[in-house]
Amino acid sequence: MSVVPPNRSQTGWPRGVTQFGNKYIQQTKPLTLERTINLYPLTNYTFGTKEPLYEKDSSVAARFQRMREEFDKIGMRRTVEGVLIVHEHRLPHVLLLQLGTTFFKLPGGELNPGEDEVEGLKRLMTEILGRQDGVLQDWVIDDCIGNWWRPNFEPPQYPYIPAHITKPKEHKKLFLVQLQEKALFAVPKNYKLVAAPLFELYDNAPGYGPIISSLPQLLSRFNFIYN
């Protein structure tokens, strides 16, 4: 059973104002109802190769052991990943790095202690996909689209901090990276760069993991323009 506040109008709350007692405070910050992002065809982009880029850790166990050791020294690990989108036949596709036959990841990695998130992601994007001819890549990063936390030194990650966790072991941020109309990417030889359509990712945690399979929902707030 709901109770209607005595000051509430029968036609709904006043729009654009906030009520505190009998006073109204005008909201000055505009609400962004629609964020427009330009997408370009996959065929606009050129993909070359460069020397292999290997993981810091030789196994999952080694990764969590290093995370444990670093946590004791510098605290929670901060990770950033970039979401790059193209389109084919007006269907959005996310660029993923494929290692082997079944492992997919977003480009990104660990931040250095004290490193700015956006500048760190630009550094990592250049290390992973940056071209080799000396031309600097212009990474446009304006939108954080997701936050994930690792509560323990174990694989599970969640888009929230569980109530009983006071010291998460890793915080991962996902950023939308807006691509220029044309670009050249250099892909490490031990990876493939694949374009996965959103309908393939949607609700497909068994194939891509919980983070990548959540991208269709995270990206649904954007209005894509297919150029």
UniProtKB/Swiss-Prot annotation:
Residues found modified as Phosphotyrosine: 40
SUPFAM superfamilies per the UniProt record, alphabetical: Nudix
Residues recorded as bearing N6-acetyllysine in the entry: 23, 29, 56
Start and end residues of each stretch annotated as Necessary for interactions with PAPOLA and PABPN1: 81-160
N-acetylserine PTM positions: 2
Keyword hit for rRNA-binding: no
Domain Nudix hydrolase: 76-201
Residues of the site described as Interaction with RNA: 55, 63
Documented effect of changing residue 103 to A: Reduces affinity for UGUA RNA by 99%
UniProt note on tissues of expression: Expressed in the heart, brain, placenta, lung, liver, skeletal muscle, kidney and pancreas.
Swiss-Prot/TrEMBL GO biological process terms: cell differentiation; co-transcriptional mRNA 3'-end processing, cleavage and polyadenylation pathway; mRNA 3'-end processing; mRNA alternative polyadenylation; mRNA processing; positive regulation of pro-B cell differentiation; positive regulation of stem cell differentiation; post-transcriptional regulation of gene expression
Renumbered residue ranges of the record's region Necessary for RNA-binding: 2-147
Keyword Transferase set for record: no
Region described as Interaction with RNA: spans on this chain: 102-104
Compartment list: Nucleus; Cytoplasm
Disulfide-bonded cysteines: none
Function: Component of the cleavage factor Im (CFIm) complex that functions as an activator of the pre-mRNA 3'-end cleavage and polyadenylation processing required for the maturation of pre-mRNA into functional mRNAs. CFIm contributes to the recruitment of multiprotein complexes on specific sequences on the pre-mRNA 3'-end, so called cleavage and polyadenylation signals (pA signals). Most pre-mRNAs contain multiple pA signals, resulting in alternative cleavage and polyadenylation (APA) producing mRNAs with variable 3'-end formation.
Family: Belongs to the Nudix hydrolase family. CPSF5 subfamily.
PANTHER family in the cross-refs: PRE-MRNA CLEAVAGE FACTOR IM, 25KD SUBUNIT
Subunit structure: Homodimer (via N- and C-terminus); binds RNA as homodimer. Component of the cleavage factor Im (CFIm) complex which is a heterotetramer composed of two subunits of NUDT21/CPSF5 and two subunits of CPSF6 or CPSF7 or a heterodimer of CPSF6 and CPSF7. The cleavage factor Im (CFIm) complex associates with the CPSF and CSTF complexes to promote the assembly of the core mRNA 3'-processing machinery. Interacts with CPSF6 (via the RRM domain); this interaction is direct and enhances binding to RNA. Interacts with CPSF7. Interacts with FIP1L1; this interaction occurs in a RNA sequence-specific manner.
Name the UniProt record assigns to this protein: Cleavage and polyadenylation specificity factor subunit 5
Organism listed in the record: Homo sapiens (Human)
Name of encoding gene: NUDT21
